[in-house]
């Protein structure tokens, strides 16, 4: 993140690549899912939430303020968690073979952990910066 008012989390280019890679893997996964009613319904949900993680992370990287960054990263966290949920269902309902999903589910878990850590860091940095302000100062 180039704006010095926003927190520096994990490497921005790396996370952009990772979130986009997950989106691409999801697109390939859903093409391999059965064309049943359940398969199509789950595929649609997985595509929406899984690609949304990458799109919303890109938006967070362009946040105008720390508050905006935190809000956008909250959306990334929610979408990543929903993606994980939707990825669990095809495996548990035996729509896909058990070995197809562990790697992508692991990556989703890692992205959630990174996102949560980034949000916590941003909140902590915001709090420490506001503590440095002098109350009722003419400089504020």
Q: Across the structure, where does each feature detected by a protein language model lie?
A:
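Amphipathic alpha-helical assembly/interaction segments
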Residues: 1-140
């Amino acid at each position: 993140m180039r704006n010095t008012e926003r927190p520096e989390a994990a490497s921005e280019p790396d996370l952009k690549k990772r979130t986009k890679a997950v989106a691409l893997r999801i697109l390939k996964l859903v093409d391999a899912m059965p064309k049943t009613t359940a398969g199509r319904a789950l595929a649609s949900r997985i595509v929406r939430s899984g690609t949304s993680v990458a799109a919303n992370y890109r938006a967070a990287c362009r946040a105008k303020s720390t508050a905006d960054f935190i809000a956008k990263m909250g959306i990334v966290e929610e979408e990543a968690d929903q993606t994980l949920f939707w990825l669990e269902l095809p495996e548990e309902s035996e729509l896909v073979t058990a070995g197809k999903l562990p790697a992508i589910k692991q990556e989703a878990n890692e992205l959630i952990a990174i996102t949560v850590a980034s949000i916590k860091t941003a909140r902590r940095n915001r709090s420490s910066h506001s503590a440095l302000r002098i109350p009722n100062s003419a400089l504020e």
